[in-house]
Each structure stands twice: as structure tokens, then as C-alpha cells.
């Protein structure tokens, strides 16, 4: 149970970081 929660949390964190990087690169291109 705990491993599943940790795995989901890790995926959410990784997705958030990837989205942040993509958004940052897109903003840099616009600027």
C-alpha cells in the first residue's frame, strides 16, 4: 500500500518537473 502511494507520488513529481521544464522552455522562446 505504502509502495503504491510512493510510486504515484513519484510519478506526479516527475510529471510536474517535466511540465515545468517544458513550460519554462516555451516561456523562454516567447521572451
UniProtKB/Swiss-Prot annotation:
Name of this chain's protein: Cytochrome b6-f complex subunit 6
Name of encoding gene: petL
Residues passing through the membrane, by range: 3-23
HAMAP family found in the cross-reference section: Cytb6_f_PetL
Keyword Transport: yes
Recorded superkingdom: Bacteria
InterPro entries associated with the record: Cyt_b6/f_cplx_su6 (IPR007802)
Organism phylogeny: Bacteria, Bacillati, Cyanobacteriota, Cyanophyceae, Nostocales
One GO MF term: electron transporter, transferring electrons within cytochrome b6/f complex of photosystem II activity
GO terms, biological process: photosynthesis
Amino acid at each position: 500500500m505504502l509502495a503504491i502511494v510512493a510510486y504515484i507520488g513519484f510519478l506526479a513529481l516527475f510529471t510536474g518537473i517535466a511540465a515545468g521544464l517544458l513550460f519554462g522552455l516555451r516561456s523562454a522562446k516567447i521572451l
